[in-house]
Structure formats: structure tokens, C-alpha cells
Amino acid sequence: YGGMWRQALESFDVMFVQNEESKKLLATLGFDNVLVAGDTRFDRVAEIARAARRIDVIDRFKGDNRLFVAGSTWEPDEELLIRLINDNPDVKFVVAPHEMDESRIARLMAETKGGALRYTQCTPRTTYGSRQLLILDTVGILASVYGYATWSYIGGGFCVGIHNTLEAATFGLPVAFGPNYEKFKEARDLVTLGAARSVTDYEQLRTWFVPLRDNEEFLQKTSRIAKDYTTRHQGATGIIVKTIFH
């Protein structure tokens, strides 16, 4: 099996890798036609952010309030988020479940003291008032919704592993997620830089959120770190295209 893959690698004129570690690994196998280009996902999320669209339902739900967006959540994430929602009545929340499980959606709606709505049930005549939670029970718009947010939470960290942190970070959002994140380099980097926090329980989530809620200077500093990180790592696509067509 290993020999088969090595033979396949020998057919390439140039191999593009994301980091120096990968280049060094290939060097130990005798390959010197390796170029560190970076991660094209940074270019992709930047493109998505530039193409983010206005969404009438989100505009009307958010109003003049600050918004917390939790994307791709699983049930253990939602257990923490319900407590955070109820402890912060002056903040609006959007929760986008990873799977549209009706029992979980019903629980979110029932346990949110400030009132909840489902995105798919909103119409031009919907009155949002003080409703605190909007459940994003649809697909294809989460990346644009991050553009409305002040803070973010990425689900999956209590289960198979966290989902895409870059979609939130590219908007300059502080990010929190569960403990299963170590295999994702960008998540490790964001934690090291202070733009993200891994939490294992509600108290850790609350401790992360409150300073970002109450200290505008700290919030802006953290946001800049997240945004600068994603900006700094853009450009891989251009390197690859330029090399191929040189």
C-alpha cells in the first residue's frame, strides 16, 4: 500500500503542501519537488465572506442588538448554549444545528426563556420583538449569518470533532468550541493566539464569554487577532495557479 502511493507521488512534477512539516516529511522519502503553498481554505472562506449577502430575516431579528451565532451544533453543545442564552437576556442568539433533529429543535424552543423562532417559519409579517433565539433550520446561509455576529461558537467539539472555525474567524469573530479540536491546525493556532477558546463545561464557556461581552477593548483586540490570522494565511490559491501556468 505504501509503495503504491509512493509510486503515484513520483508521477507529479510539483507537489503543493500546506506547511513545512509536510515538505520535510516528503523530503525524507526522497522528494524535493515540493512547494509550500499554504491552505487554500483560507482563500475560500475569504471569498465566501466577500460574497456574504444580507438576509432580511436576520436583519429584522437582530435589530440593534448584538448577536451570538452558534454554527453546526450537536446536542452537547446545545446543552451549554441554552444556559448561555438564558443567562444573557440582552443578547440575541442564532443556533444552527448540524442535524435538523425535531426533538432537539423543540427542546431549544421550549427551554429558551426569552422566546424562540424557527427560520423556516418566519415570514415578512413575523414580529420578532424581544424573541431571543432564532433557530437556523435551513442550509446554505450560515456563512452569511456569521457576518452579523459579534461572537461565535462552533459545534462538534464534544463529538466527532469541531466543524469549520475559519468561516467565523474570517469575519473577525472570537470563537469557542468543545474539547475535540486538536487535529485541526487552524483551531490550535487560534487558541494559541487567544482568538479562540476550548471549553469543557458551561462555567468555562461563561468565563470566556463574559469578558468579551463586557469589555469592548478586549473584544476588539480579540476580533483583530482572528481577522489578522485568516488574512495572513491567504494566498495559497494564487501560488498554485501561478506555478502551474508559469
Tell what function each PLM region has.
Residues 1-246:
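Nucleotide-activated sugar donor-binding and catalytic core shared by glycosyltransferases
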